[in-house]
């Protein structure tokens, strides 16, 4: 039989409630693509998550106000600080580089004072003078500033690079004075980005560390699994 006044709704604890436009008639055997509803998260609810949660959302098909069909779909949600590792969207690691945090800004100020002691100039000019040594001096000042914080190193979880881990953000690392290799790497990357210096996070089995571009270039893609690329970039005469 033909269906009259058809609409679709979607909603759940972590999914925004939506309802499609009404289709006055859908003939038997015909197909209709409904594009004005989507699985959209409730951002505020997601930010409140502190642990992994298994939830669901419901899709219902109406004829007028009569429910013709109701289906529930499982939804696995992670806390906002969960990184899923290198096997699932590894490029999402970049979202944990947070150059605009106030704590990162304070580290820039501290590093600026150290840079003045080292070079006589306190300004972070990133790549403006075209001299790789200037970049090295700026990176050294930032490293020295972070080193003076006395942050304690703690080990990463086993196989973290494959299965991921909870990431302590830069401000929390500075507040708690502790972090593992990936968190310290992201902290350093955050401060570098705040002053305009390009960096890259290198992930190895059981470890992570930072690489810095000494000239104003960067890799065109967000991820690279070719070790020879790094080897060539680190060769003598290449910045």
Per-region residue spans from a language model:
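Secondary-structure boundary elements
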Residues: 104-176
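Short beta-strand elements
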Residues: 65-100
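Structured catalytic cores of large enzymes
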Residues: 38, 71-73, 93-118
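Mixed-charge (Asp/Glu-Lys/Arg
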Residues: 41, 49, 54, 70-75, ...
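Hydrophobic/aromatic-rich core segments of domains that either
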Residues: 179-239
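Intrinsically disordered, low-complexity Pro/Gly/Ser/Thr-rich segments with frequent PxxP/GP/PP motifs
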Residues: 4-56, 60-69
């Amino acid at each position: 039989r033909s269906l009259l006044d058809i609409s679709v709704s979607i909603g759940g604890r972590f999914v925004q409630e939506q309802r499609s436009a009404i289709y006055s008639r859908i003939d038997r055997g015909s197909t209709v693509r409904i594009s004005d509803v989507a699985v959209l998260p409730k951002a505020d609810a997601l930010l409140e998550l502190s642990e992994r949660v298994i939830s669901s959302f419901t899709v219902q098909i109406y004829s007028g106000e009569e429910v013709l069909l109701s289906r529930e779909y499982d939804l696995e949600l992670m806390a906002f600080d969960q990184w899923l590792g290198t096997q699932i969207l590894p490029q999402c690691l970049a979202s944990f580089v947070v150059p605009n945090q106030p704590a990162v800004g304070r580290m820039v100020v501290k590093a600026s004072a150290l840079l003045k002691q080292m070079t006589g100039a306190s300004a972070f000019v990133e790549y403006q003078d075209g001299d790789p040594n200037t970049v090295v001096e700026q990176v050294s000042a930032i490293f020295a500033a972070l080193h003076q914080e006395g942050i304690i190193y703690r080990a990463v979880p086993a196989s973290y690079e494959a299965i991921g881990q909870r990431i302590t953000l830069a401000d929390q690392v500075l507040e708690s004075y502790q972090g593992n290799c990936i968190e310290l790497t992201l902290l350093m990357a955050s401060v570098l980005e705040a002053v305009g210096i390009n960096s890259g996070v290198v992930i190895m089995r059981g470890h992570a560390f930072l690489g810095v571009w000494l000239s104003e270039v960067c890799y065109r893609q967000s991820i690279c699994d070719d070790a020879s690329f790094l080897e060539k970039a680190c060769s003598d005469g290449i910045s």
